Curated annotation (Swiss-Prot):
Enzyme nomenclature, EC number: 1.14.99.15
UniProt keyword Metal-binding present: yes
Superkingdom of this protein's organism: Bacteria
Molecular function in Gene Ontology: 4-methoxybenzoate monooxygenase (O-demethylating) activity; heme binding; iron ion binding
Assembly notes: Interacts with the ferredoxin-like iron-sulfur protein ThcC.
InterPro entries on file: Cyt_P450 (IPR001128), Cyt_P450_CS (IPR017972), Cyt_P450_sf (IPR036396)
Entry-linked Pfam families: p450 (PF00067)
Gene (UniProt): cyp199a2
Broad class of enzyme this protein falls into: oxidoreductase
Protein name, UniProt field: Cytochrome p450 CYP199A2
Protein source organism: Rhodopseudomonas palustris (strain ATCC BAA-98 / CGA009)
Length: 412
């Protein structure tokens, strides 16, 4: 078990990175994205708090410090941006999120609305339909011979077949949803090629999303219409409602797509674990959780200090960016036994793949439901999952995911 790091206010601000190890690692470089694990180990072993000279930010890569930062939103705020850009110094590229880029108490009010829309009762109501759609998708893929691209044909196709309907979106234009989510997560990074090219290509995706978030374009009974209904009760304003719909459009899809992709990739690489899942399909939920821990589709997020603070013995001044390495925390041997092993019976509670604290991923219940029913369908209907060709990574400043993963599904 890890012990909580000390977190105390200090009266004298520090110079940038004074008293902590300075590292030349660039966590936004393509070679880092290709294989982040060696450098994540370097980050963890260097100390509980480090300074990354490339981008002039502090970094925390061990579980204890990542957890501490996530769970102290008053000291480590989100309203100045959860990417490298500091909204106090730079204009945001879009109107800030009322969920992701907000702090309590404002965040508490808007988050409460989404929590009501995406309640456990709502997930229970959706479960049978989502499970039937997962069964139908696996049947369809097996009927095609089982030689598929796990990303386009399953990890993307399944969520796109159920989530937009649950949101109440029109059929036309749904192809904009994934590029928009990719744009949002690239924009959290530095002004590199990934960020710049995503923003340059973003006009049609942004226009589509802005239009879909308006009340007249959302079908009655869907998540979007339910969000707008809260503006009638005064819990949110009519101006806030479209921004909350926008938050759900990205949070409810990208986490699911990358989580399912991670899980299928893990089960293909570790056939013994897939055999355990086939023997006990009730492990589907935990197999999905373990894949989110193991692969950590959301790798990083930033916070900004609201005051001078001491974290694990390191003094950090007010207004400093702190980069949290979620993926590294999820493989920290100080917290996890044998962290580099995918184990579908592991006690995964506490992983930070969906964040932690008040800003825990708003789409997590949707992602978990979809992930569980897809893996349960695979467990019942498929005897083997084998990698059938070279994979291709999809590079993103925040997300770790795959562009393509050829696999062969053998029917049970």
């Amino acid at each position: 078990m890890t012990t909580a790091p000390s977190l105390v206010p200090v009266t004298t601000p520090s110079q940038h990175g004074a008293g902590v190890p300075h590292l030349g690692i660039d966590p936004f470089a393509l070679d880092y994205f290709a294989d982040p694990y060696p450098e994540q180990e370097t980050l963890r072993e260097a100390g509980p708090v480090v300074y990354l000279d490339k981008w002039n930010v502090y970094g925390v890569a061990r579980y204890a410090e990542v957890y501490a930062v996530l769970n102290d939103p008053l000291t480590f705020c989100s309203s100045r941006g959860v990417g490298l850009s500091d909204f106090k110094k730079e204009k945001p590229w879009r109107p800030p999120s009322l969920i992701l880029e907000a702090d309590p108490p404002a965040h508490t009010r808007t988050r409460a609305v989404l929590s009501k829309v995406l309640s456990p009762a709502t997930m229970k109501r959706l479960r049978d339909g989502f499970a039937a759609a997962a069964d139908a998708k696996i049947d369809e893929l097996l009927a095609r011979g089982g030689n598929i691209d796990a990303i386009a044909d399953l990890a993307e196709a399944y969520p796109l077949s159920v989530f937009p309907d649950a949101m109440g979106l029109k059929q036309e234009g749904r192809e904009n949803l994934l590029p928009y989510a990719g744009l949002v997560f690239n924009a959290f990074g530095p002004p590199n090629e990934l960020r710049q090219s995503a923003i340059e290509r973003s006009a049609p995706h942004q226009a589509y999303v802005a239009e879909q978030c308006q009340r007249p374009n959302l079908a009655p009974g869907g998540f979007g219409a339910c969000i707008h209904a809260f503006s009638d009760t005064g819990e949110i304003t009519p101006e806030e409602a479209p921004l909350l719909v926008r938050s759900l459009l990205s949070a409810g899809l990208d986490t699911t797509v990358n989580g399912i992709a991670a899980a299928v990739y893990c089960l293909a690489r570790f056939p013994d674990e897939f055999a355990r899942l086939r023997a006990d399909p009730s492990l589907a939920r935990n197999a999905f959780e373990e894949a989110v821990r193991f692969e950590s589709p959301v790798q990083t997020f930033f916070r900004t200090t609201t005051r001078d603070v001491e974290l694990a013995g390191a003094t950090i001044g007010e207004g400093e960016k702190v980069l949290m390495f979620l993926g590294s925390a999820n493989r920290d041997p100080r917290r996890w036994d044998d962290p580099d092993r995918y184990d579908i019976t592991r006690k995964t509670s506490g992983h930070v793949g969906f964040g932690s604290g008040v800003h825990m991923c708003v789409g997590q219940l949707v992602a978990r439901l979809e992930g569980e029913v897809v893996l349960a369908a695979l467990a019942r209907k498929v005897a083997a999952i084998e990698i059938a060709g070279p994979l291709k990574r999809r590079f993103n400043n925040t997300l770790r995911g795959l562009e393509s993963l050829p696999i062969q599904l053998t029917p049970a």
